[in-house]
Amino acid sequence: MHSVDPTTEQMIRAVLAYAENRLRVLRRMPHPGRGFTQGLTVAEGTVWESTGGYGESALQRYELGAAQPGPRAALPPELFGEGICRIRAHLWQLTWRERVALRWDARSLDLLSTIPFNREGWGICAADGCVLTSDGTSELVRRDPATLEPLEVIRVRLDGERVTDLNDLEWAAGRVWANLFGQRYLVGIDPDSGEVTDLVDAKAVMERHWGDPEAVLNGVAALPGDGEFLLTGKNWRSMYHVQLVDDRPRKQPARLLAG
């Protein structure tokens, strides 16, 4: 069982006390199927969702705001589905510990190929000319979008300290956005330096799901609009169209962490 890195949590709590992006909930929607969400991506009003669990993992597609799930493709029972991203007409789906990635037709949900993958699979997103992946550590890997071959390792830091538990990923406004496993925080990351540039406390949506230890935030996808995202979590009843609101003056993390 993966545990949350307490150092990362304490560090982010300290910084969030002074510099925070607030979430404004614009719309609450049903979460079709209430799956064990591991990955999420949206394009032109269509949502693709990866759900996990051995013998329960699947890839499904539905329209944004739909109450009922749409087409669904089950994974083999020995695979645990993780993050997904869309590259033109295809989808990449990672698996947790099985060291393979799946390539799907985005429209038909036909499985096209299975390839070796060199790490645990957590999150994946399409970026400028590449894809980026996470494995629950403080590292992101830049990869070839056609083959997933690794090109570069990016070490994520906040004021020189490692930020671990990087989970589902999304690309928006020149930043990599990640939710942190088991926590209520999102971080925005500079893809060139690996430095955390944005911190978001998602308590506005988390507080509606407290009480279930497995119902953690997991699933972030960019939506049209400035700073707008779709958020959900494992077994959540709802999905949330949110907007980031930067309503506090920024200070340097170094000064904050030094007290």
Named regions from a protein language model:
Residues 63-67, 105-109, 145-148, 190-194, ...:
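Short loop/turn segments that connect beta-strands within beta-propeller blades
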Residues 48-55, 91-98, 131-137, 178-182, ...:
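Conserved beta-strand positions in repeat-built beta-propeller and related beta-rich domains
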Residues 33-44, 77-87, 117-131, 160-174, ...:
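Beta-rich, blade/repeat-based domains predominating
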Residues 24-30, 68-74, 110-115, 152-161, ...:
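A short beta-strand motif characteristic of beta-propeller blades
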Residues 101-159:
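Hydrophobic, well-structured mid-protein blocks that either form specific transmembrane helices
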Residues 67-103, 109-123:
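Blade-loop segments of beta-propeller domains
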Residues 26-58, 72-85, 122, 233-240:
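Beta-strand-rich domains and repeat architectures in extracellular enzymes and scaffolds
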Residues 13-33, 64-68:
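A short helix->beta-strand "capping" segment at the edge of beta-propeller domains
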